[in-house]
């Protein structure tokens, strides 16, 4: 049984070779550093989290953003073929944390195309689109962006709130209440989903 599982995994990996495994490895390492820093920030209370995230922006996000700019200018948005599915997801996650509006905007079209080709999972796509809109002071579409206010997570302004779950379902996401439960567990903070904005 173990042998056949290993054989299947080896064959699957061979069927989808990455043409740039070094870039994939670099993206995964960058992602790991990013996530470790954010997990450390999640351990504090609301105010401590905000301070920690500001420090993370300086220490982690700015250098990562410089490298993402280099990658995008050299290769465009990386594909599954170039860096594998996990490499694409790592690039996307790092891009969401990048303090560079121009880069994020340039990547929107290729990310949307990759999502339609099923190279990007629904939650990663929703997070990207929503965060981009919120940073432009526009209502989000999928309800994935929350802010820390008064020591709790509050969903950012969301377009057409009553049809939110329909939009989420259309792209393969669970209802907003399920997502809120996961956020509460991860951040150990109360979660608020306003009925109206």
For every predicted segment, state its role.
Residues 9, 60, 103, 159-160:
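Generic detector of ordered secondary-structure context
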Residues 89-91, 95, 104-188:
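Mature-region segments of soluble proteins
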Residues 19-137:
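N-terminal helix-rich structural modules
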Residues 9-17:
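Hydrophobic h-region of N-terminal signal peptides that target proteins for export
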Residues 1-8:
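Sec-dependent signal peptide recognition
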Residues 185-197:
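Intrinsically disordered, compositionally biased glycine-rich interaction modules
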């Amino acid at each position: 049984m173990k042998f056949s599982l290993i054989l299947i995994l080896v064959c699957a990996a061979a069927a989808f070779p990455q043409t740039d495994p070094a870039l994939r490895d670099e993206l995964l390492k960058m992602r790991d550093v990013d996530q470790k820093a954010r997990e450390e920030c999640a351990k504090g209370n609301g105010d401590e989290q905000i301070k920690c995230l500001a420090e993370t922006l300086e220490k982690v996000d700015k250098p990562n953003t410089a490298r993402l700019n280099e990658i995008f200018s050299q290769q465009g948005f990386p594909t599954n073929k170039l860096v594998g599915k996990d490499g694409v997801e790592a690039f996307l996650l790092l891009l969401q944390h990048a303090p560079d509006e121009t880069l994020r905007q340039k990547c929107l079209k290729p990310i949307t195309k990759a999502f339609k080709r099923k190279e990007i999972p629904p939650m990663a796509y929703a997070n990207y689109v929503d965060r981009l809109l919120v940073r432009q002071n526009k209502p989000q579409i999928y309800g994935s962006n929350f802010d820390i206010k008064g020591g709790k997570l509050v969903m950012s302004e969301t377009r057409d709130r009553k049809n939110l779950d329909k939009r989420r379902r259309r792209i393969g996401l669970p209802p907003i209440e399920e997502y809120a439960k996961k956020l509460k567990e991860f951040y150990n903070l109360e979660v608020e989903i306003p009925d109206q904005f």
